[in-house]
Amino acid sequence: MSKKIIDEVIDILEDKKYTYTMIEYPEHNRKSVDIVLNSKEPTLIRVSEDKITKEEISDLKKIAVSTLTASLVVTNEEEEDIVSVKADNVFAISPEGFKKVINGEKIFLYRTRGGIFIKIRNYILKHKREEMGYSIGDVAKFLGVSRKAIYDYEKGDSDVSLEVAEKLIDLFGDDIIGDVIWDSIKSKKEILEEGVAEFSPENFKAKLIYKLKESGLNALSLKLTAADLIVKDSDNNRYLVTIENKDYNKSMKKFYEAKKLASYTKSELVIIIRTSKMLKECEDLGYKTYEENDIHSLIDEIKGSNGRQG
């Protein structure tokens, strides 16, 4: 992690008196979450001076979509006023751009593989078009695009080039321009787990995912943070599941950091215990715990019956 960038991020948060917590697990390897910000919506922050990995992006996407919020990757690789969209709800931004976000300024330019676009507020576009009596054909002709493009703009399936945005502003005013981050949050998109390994006695995590999914629960695997799984029930209640490691001290650190992550993302923490010594320790600390051979009780708890409080 770049000390310089992390210091900039913390200075920005301290200056605006934001409440945040540092996630300090794993300690000596790459991790997907550095900071969780407690704003009007919890926000995940990953600080990186080099290229972020696919696994980091995958974790950030899963947590952000599951918790209906944004993941921000703060990096020097981005330009000040342009956001790079890495995945659903995952946005890369410069330290200067991050400061603008924290200050409540609108960031409306974003980059994808297809080029640079401007975020528009589709619901305002449709409302103003109808209010002013324009047909879809009228607007398409004025902008020099197809009728299908206007349908896509109004459904929120497509944003616009700089040239088209200028014409839209001329026609409807600048309040049609949106915010790349906060107007892009996807809340109901189902994330499909990619490549979950076949379970075996040695692969307890894969076995757990299989059993949870078999019971009709949505379970997503995390690889580079303190929680191992995100689980959601049919009522959209969220659980962060953390599995005991072989190393006692690392496990205790992992549980503590997972508790912070759960608290800031408004999720319930559940710990899977694999040794009797750790079971007593965790119960004494007030953690909700289940033994690894008691998965059915964990499933009952998440589905609303027969749980036990550790």
UniProtKB/Swiss-Prot annotation:
Classification via Pfam families: HTH_3
Annotated ranges, domain HTH cro/C1-type: 125-180
Origin superkingdom: Archaea
GO molecular function: DNA binding; DNA-binding transcription factor activity
DNA bind region: 136-155
SMART domains: HTH_XRE (SM00530)
Keywords: DNA-binding, Transcription, Transcription regulation
Stated name of the protein: Putative HTH-type transcriptional regulatory protein SSO0942
